[in-house]
Swiss-Prot record:
Protein name: Large-conductance mechanosensitive channel
Keywords of this entry: Cell membrane, Ion channel, Ion transport, Membrane, Transmembrane, Transmembrane helix, Transport
Subunit structure: Homopentamer.
Subcellular location, principal: membrane
Matching SUPFAM superfamilies: Gated mechanosensitive channel
PANTHER family, A to Z: LARGE-CONDUCTANCE MECHANOSENSITIVE CHANNEL (PTHR30266:SF2), MECHANOSENSITIVE CHANNEL MSCL (PTHR30266)
GO cellular component terms given for this protein: plasma membrane
Length: 126
């Protein structure tokens, strides 16, 4: 049982997933701070000093904090858009690397092509 767990835990996909979750959590905190500490106050200034986190109403004895919900929606869209831009950038880098690999042929392959062409010429002369 221990060997199975060890092989599962050391498998590349599990480690990659764990690293992704940790980095994603840290990235989420950065974006949340960006939204809460920079963007929302600026948006509040543009809207006449409106503070979204203070928006609420009382229903019976419950306080409904819809301003915090609006702020969470803004966080979601900014995080989603940031991740989209990051993935798009990484995809372009991968595509560029793939094109560079195709553009630079392997020297051995070129040598083999030359040998093949020389053999064809010799065969055609005979």
């Amino acid at each position: 049982m221990w060997k199975e767990f060890k092989s599962f835990a050391i498998r590349g996909n599990v480690i990659d997933l764990a690293i992704g979750v940790i980095i994603g959590g840290a990235f989420g905190k950065i974006v949340t701070s960006l939204v809460n500490d920079l963007m929302m106050p600026l948006l509040g200034l543009l809207l006449g000093g409106l503070d979204f986190s203070a928006l609420s109403f009382t229903f019976v004895d419950a306080e409904i904090k819809y301003g915090l919900f609006i702020q969470s929606i803004v966080n979601f869209f900014i995080i989603s858009f940031s991740i989209f831009l990051f993935i798009r950038y990484i995809s372009k880098l991968k595509k560029k690397d793939a094109e560079e690999e195709k553009a630079a042929p392997d020297p051995q392959e070129e040598l083999l092509k030359e040998i093949r062409d020389l053999l064809k010429e010799q065969t055609n002369r005979s």
